[in-house]
UniProtKB/Swiss-Prot annotation:
Sequence similarity: Belongs to the polysaccharide synthase family.
Protein's name in the database: Uncharacterized membrane protein MJ1068
Source organism of this protein record: Methanocaldococcus jannaschii (strain ATCC 43067 / DSM 2661 / JAL-1 / JCM 10045 / NBRC 100440) (Methanococcus jannaschii)
Keywords of the record: Cell membrane, Membrane, Transmembrane, Transmembrane helix
Domain of life: Archaea
Length: 507
């Protein structure tokens, strides 16, 4: 199988999983928005953000090092080193996750009183906050570390069909358990998502533990485990850079939720984390799908010295990602209230301005997701780390400055500018390392086509009263004009698109 076919196959699996998981994820959020009090929804996401910030301490970057070294040892046919890497990372990651979870359980009363309830919204109900912290610590945080370990093994072996399926199984399990608790047991509070996430982790450990043991371990079951200094040094030297970088990405991804919890309260967290961010993050699904494939594949291409092939592939990925994300971002920025009314309810209309602002950052988020996977794949996690900390430092400073005064709008503005600053540095390093100029005039043409395609929509919108029909008609008109513009200006080649589609169908 050629690298192009392998890439198309891998991306297709991940896109399919996002296509299946995204509607379910939205159903989960719609369910919570309509069946659980907004304050309890905010509580759950505040606790989830808290544990997400602690994820960096449950593996010290060794999970990502595993993805980096599995294809390397496979290419070198070093099955002994491969098995040793998996065993070492698995043991250490499990121990670290348990220690952190145990410490959170011990200090749960203090975390609940002085952080989660800083605005006094759960005064008199602190027992609920403490219980949610304990459930998420021992359930979601600890057990999910084992799920992540299995998922990273599958990704490292480039078994993209299994790796991508974790996305669907995860959210589907949460959805099913949430339905059971709400409609069968009549539970309507923060226990619903918390316990659902715990049970989801149990289900996934059973399923993917079986797949890993059945599909992968027989290949090197007879190999001895060797804990050599070189192996441990390689894993830690790569993993520590990734860990430091991952800490930066966590600051970028969750610091806004942390600051909103502390400075503005849990209703703002519900707006931002249950509506605004998830809505805009849909736009990055293509980039995440591509990135999951490019990480191990770029590692393999780089190890074999195929720099030109890698550069060509990255250029195409950037262009196609921009073409896909641009129209969706523009429409999302133009119809935020329509989207909220259709998918959620009027209680969450206060999230509309944040959606508009974050939509413009979706393009930079897309590029950054792809670029970081490339940098990590070619063995430059130190560069990723530097860029991430530039963005994280910006976010840290401006979240503290803007959120107390502007709330979720301040969080959204900070996030978008953080993405943009990182993209500037990232594209410069990629141009230098791969000796290729990625930024070109086609990118500008794509954005211009996206903007001008909106003009007819502005006139059509006011002619239709029904919001669903309005969104449908405007979407059809917009995409029709946009596609004509993309092919009319020869930004992409129709024959190449047909070639990609044919490869997807064959798979």
């Amino acid at each position: 199988m050629s690298y192009k076919e392998k890439a198309v196959k891998g991306v297709s699996w991940h896109l399919l999983s996002y296509f299946l998981a995204a509607p379910i994820a939205y159903l989960v959020r719609v369910l919570y928005a309509n069946e659980i009090p907004k304050l309890d929804v905010g509580l759950f996401y505040a606790v989830l953000d808290f544990f997400s910030m602690l994820v960096v301490f449950r593996a010290f970057g060794l999970d990502q090092a595993l993805i980096r070294y599995i294809p390397k040892y496979l290419a070198e046919n070093r099955l002994d080193m491969l098995k040793s890497s998996i065993v070492f990372v698995g043991i250490l990651q499990t121990i670290l996750a348990f220690i952190v979870a145990f410490l959170v359980v011990i200090f749960a009363p203090y975390i609940a009183e002085f952080y989660i309830n800083n605005q006094g919204q759960f005064t008199g109900r602190l027992d609920l906050v403490i219980n949610i912290l304990i459930i998420m610590a021992m359930g979601y945080y600890f057990l999910d570390s084992i799920v992540a370990f299995f998922s990273n093994i599958l990704t490292g072996f480039q078994l993209q069909n299994y790796a991508s399926s974790t996305r669907v199984v995860r959210i589907l399990s949460v959805f099913i358990f949430s339905l059971i608790f709400i409609y069968l047991f009549n539970v309507h509070n923060a226990y619903v998502p918390s316990v659902s996430y715990l049970l989801m982790a149990v289900v996934m450990i059973i399923i993917y533990g079986y797949i890993v043991v059945k599909k992968i371990f027989p290949k090197f079951a007879k190999e001895k485990v060797i804990f050599s200094r070189k192996l441990i040094r390689n894993l830690f030297s790569y993993g520590m850079y990734v860990m430091i970088g991952y800490a930066g990405s966590l600051i970028l991804g969750y610091l806004d939720g942390i600051c909103l919890t502390y400075f503005t309260g849990l209703n703002a967290v519900a707006d931002y984390r249950n509506v605004a961010m998830p809505t805009v993050n849909i736009l990055s699904y293509f980039a995440f799908s591509v990135g999951a494939v490019l990480f191990p594949m770029s590692s393999e291409l780089w190890e074999k010295g195929y720099k030109k092939a890698l550069s060509y592939g990255v250029e195409k990925v950037f262009l196609y990602s921009l073409i896909i994300v641009t129209p969706l971002a523009i429409l999302m920025a133009y119809f935020p209230t329509v989207i909220i009314n259709i998918l959620f309810n009027p209680k969450y209309l206060s999230a509309a301005p944040a959606i508009q602002i974050l939509s413009f950052g979706a393009m930079f988020l897309t590029f950054n997701s792809i670029g970081f996977n490339i940098l990590n794949g070619i063995g430059r996690p130190n560069i990723s780390t530097k860029i991430l900390y530039i963005g994280a430092s910006f976010n840290l400073i401006f979240n503290i400055l803007l959120i107390p005064k502007f709330g979720i709008i301040g969080a959204a503005i900070t996030t978008v500018f953080g993405y943009f600053i990182m993209w500037i540095f990232q594209i410069w390093f990629l141009n230098k390392l791969l000796e290729h100029q990625f930024l070109n005039k086609k990118w500008i043409l794509v954005i211009l086509v996206g903007i001008f395609s909106l003009i007819p929509v502005m006139f059509i919108k006011d002619l239709i009263d029904n919001v669903i029909l309005q969104l449908f008609v405007c979407g059809v008109v917009y995409f029709g004009i946009y596609i004509l513009g993309i092919f009319g200006l020869k930004i992409i080649n129709i024959y190449e698109v047909k070639d990609i589609i044919s490869k997807i169908i064959k798979r």
